[in-house]
Amino acid sequence: MAVPKKRTSILKKRIRKNLWKKGGYWAALKAFSLAKSLATGNSKSFFCTTNK
C-alpha cells in the first residue's frame, strides 16, 4: 500500500478543504437562483407548464 512520506501541513489541508466547500457553496447558490427564476416565471432555460 502506498503511504505518503510526509504529513500534510494544516495550512494545506485547510486550503484544500475551503476550496472543496466553496464548490458546494456555488452549486447551492446556482440551484437557489434557478429555483427563484422558476418560481417567478423569469426562467429562460426551462419550459415549465403551469396548471390553471
From Swiss-Prot:
It is found in: Plastid, Chloroplast. One of its GO terms (molecular function) is structural constituent of ribosome. Its main location: plastid. SUPFAM superfamilies: Zn-binding ribosomal proteins (SSF57829). GO terms for biological process: translation. GO terms for cellular component: chloroplast; large ribosomal subunit. The keyword Transmembrane helix does not apply. Keywords: Chloroplast, Plastid, Ribonucleoprotein, Ribosomal protein. The keyword Transport does not apply. Belongs to the bacterial ribosomal protein bL32 family. This is Large ribosomal subunit protein bL32c. It comes from Citrus sinensis (Sweet orange). The lineage of its organism: Eukaryota, Viridiplantae, Streptophyta, Embryophyta, Tracheophyta. The gene is rpl32.
